[in-house]
């Protein structure tokens, strides 16, 4: 019995390591919980540094249907999701490519709020063929995969962080992006009527 060899499967070992890492991260998040007002202040500070940064926080797409009618789709960009995730804190976000069948590439993102133990998984598919059916080159597939992963990241982060909390600061950022805010510093402070020492 002393010389008995115990076989440990690699997959099981990796799962155990991942579980241990998550447990440590959750314990740390519980020990150092986020300050929501401080997080929102950070979002405002990062997003409203200047008009160009504020503009990067949003995307606008113009689409035309079969009847020739055009419509405008707008929303928060990947950059804004990165700012929100970094300022919010105590988040665990992972992205990966989970599928490539030669026609479509599928990216997955998982966002886990370590404080609330609420997690969301989002998948994004992107075509990797031309209109004529020719498959993209390897380099273009990598580029498309990275873009899909970024979009999945954005969707997962925005699904986890409550929109009701970030809505007001997002509106302030939009005003700066549109050039309608009188003063970036004033707009940032007015989000919560804070004093200069609190900003």
Q: Whereabouts are the PLM-identified features?
A:
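Polyanion-binding surfaces on beta-sheet-dominated domains and ring/shell assemblies
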Residues: 1-105, 110-199
């Amino acid at each position: 019995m002393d010389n008995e060899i115990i076989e440990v499967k690699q997959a099981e070992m990796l799962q155990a390591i991942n579980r241990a890492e998550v447990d440590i991260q959750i314990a740390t998040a519980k020990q150092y919980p986020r300050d929501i007002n401080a997080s929102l202040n950070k979002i405002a500070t990062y997003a409203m540094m200047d008009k160009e940064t504020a503009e990067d926080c949003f995307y606008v797409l113009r689409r035309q249907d079969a009847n020739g009618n055009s419509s405008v789709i707008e929303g928060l960009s990947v950059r804004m999701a990165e700012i929100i995730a970094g300022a919010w804190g105590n988040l665990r976000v992972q992205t990966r490519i989970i599928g490539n069948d030669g026609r479509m590439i599928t990216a997955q993102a998982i966002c886990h709020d370590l404080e609330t133990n609420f997690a969301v998984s989002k998948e994004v598919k992107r075509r990797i063929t031309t209109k004529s059916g020719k498959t993209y080159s390897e380099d273009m597939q990598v580029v498309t995969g990275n873009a899909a992963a970024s979009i999945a990241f954005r969707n997962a982060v925005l699904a986890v962080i409550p929109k009701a909390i970030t809505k007001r600061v997002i509106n302030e950022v939009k005003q700066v992006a549109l050039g309608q805010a009188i003063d970036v510093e004033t707009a940032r402070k007015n989000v919560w009527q804070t004093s200069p020492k609190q900003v």
